[in-house]
Curated annotation (Swiss-Prot):
Cysteine pairings via disulfide bonds: C7-C37, C19-C50, C36-C41
Source species: Camelus dromedarius
Function description: Insulin decreases blood glucose concentration. It increases cell permeability to monosaccharides, amino acids and fatty acids. It accelerates glycolysis, the pentose phosphate cycle, and glycogen synthesis in liver.
Highest taxon listed in the record's lineage: Eukaryota
Any GO BP: glucose metabolic process
Protein name in UniProt: Insulin
Lineage of producing organism: Eukaryota, Metazoa, Chordata, Craniata, Vertebrata
GO CC terms in record: extracellular space
UniProt family annotation: Belongs to the insulin family.
Family annotation (SMART domains): IlGF (SM00078)
Quaternary structure annotation from Swiss-Prot or TrEMBL: Heterodimer of a B chain and an A chain linked by two disulfide bonds.
InterPro entries: Insulin, Insulin-like, Insulin-like_sf, Insulin_CS, Insulin_family
Length: 51
């Protein structure tokens, strides 16, 4: 998993993949769009959004 731009449905799919059964919380205030769509994010950064 390389650092990459993840936007919209791609971002949601990546969260499902990374978080699995733990699930995740998606709140725009958390800055995930800025971190992963406007910029690039890593697997480690995505894990911060898992429950």
């Amino acid at each position: 998993f390389a650092n990459q731009h993840l936007c919209g449905s791609h971002l949601v799919e990546a969260l499902y993949l990374v978080c699995g059964e733990r699930g995740f919380f998606y709140t725009p205030k958390a800055g995930i769009v800025e971190q992963c769509c406007a910029s690039v994010c890593s697997l480690y950064q995505l894990e911060n959004y898992c429950n």
